[in-house]
């Protein structure tokens, strides 16, 4: 039996006040609908039907390369009508899981619990109990005694509910699992004879009860999982909830967060033990932190690997880079893609490294640019040093071998190799290879002019 996931994503989202389709608004730098798609994959979906409407070009530009079956809902006539558009792509023996593109925080474990609750040839719906259920469809059950729950007999929408039904605090989330054959039959029976004039997907629950089909329920661990975002205030609330959840995962994995409410996780972060993360740190993409790593305030880490005992000092940007054991960068350092710091290497403030390897114990303390370079072990790079790697058309490599000392304000015009043990005098411009243990100085000879007078300001 295949798992066929239907994701409803046709709404415009008028209250967002945006040209962007509602489901493309981001949580943690990823669109809401992408979160839902990713979770659908995690539960083992065999096919995903994406029901779309408004903003088709933008949706396809964002999601087009993925394995999705695009299903057009030309008119938005309700959730039942939306799912009905996907009917031709649903086999009788499919299990159909219905999700919503603007409910991004739904968890894999919750959907697995829902599918586990699915009776044979029956229906499983995801419900939640709210202290204030205003605006939501209510779960109607048969009367029962004591603490036992009655059987689900239907779902009544807020606008169609009686005064007694409005007292029910178990609400419908809209998420459900349904056998494909029965779903198609029930969808064909839907009517829009209701206060909204829409085809409610929820009406199939009453049909299932009338047909004698078993209906079971499951509930999420937290109600926030099933909340949607209809405006930017709600979007921000979901963002904070997502960040709180991700911060908790890091702490449980061994990270110490100086303030869990001041961290942004916009990707997948893996941490070792005794990691220290200061405030206002941003993680994007895939980031791995080893044991005893320290991340300073305001740092930004993007798609990088940080080994044990390494330190990222405040306000550094580390992107597509690797730091070895006990290496350090910052404060205010920038490591661009292809940068690699070996064990005990140090990159200091206002140093930029791009597509360069910095060897064991080597240091560039301040105010340097190191691009397209291979730097050996035990090298000292003086302040103001630049690898001149670009000739206006092509990039060229600078090689600095072990134990080289580069004086301040040195320009290395690539391609060039500085051999082991060489010393480059401050202010030099190096255009040719340097041999082992050589001292090279290219600056202009110093002149002393006696009797020279400094200009004075002319009084007007």
UniProtKB/Swiss-Prot annotation:
Binding positions for acetyl-CoA per the UniProt entry: 383, 389-390, 408, 426, 443
Location of region: N-acetyltransferase: 254-460
Enzyme class: transferase
Biological or metabolic pathway of the protein: Nucleotide-sugar biosynthesis; UDP-N-acetyl-alpha-D-glucosamine biosynthesis; N-acetyl-alpha-D-glucosamine 1-phosphate from alpha-D-glucosamine 6-phosphate (route II): step 2/2; Nucleotide-sugar biosynthesis; UDP-N-acetyl-alpha-D-glucosamine biosynthesis; UDP-N-acetyl-alpha-D-glucosamine from N-acetyl-alpha-D-glucosamine 1-phosphate: step 1/1; Bacterial outer membrane biogenesis; LPS lipid A biosynthesis
Molecular function terms, GO-annotated: glucosamine-1-phosphate N-acetyltransferase activity; magnesium ion binding; UDP-N-acetylglucosamine diphosphorylase activity
Record protein name field: Bifunctional protein GlmU
Region called Linker, residue ranges: 233-253
Active-site residues, record numbering mapped to chain: 366
Coiled coil: none
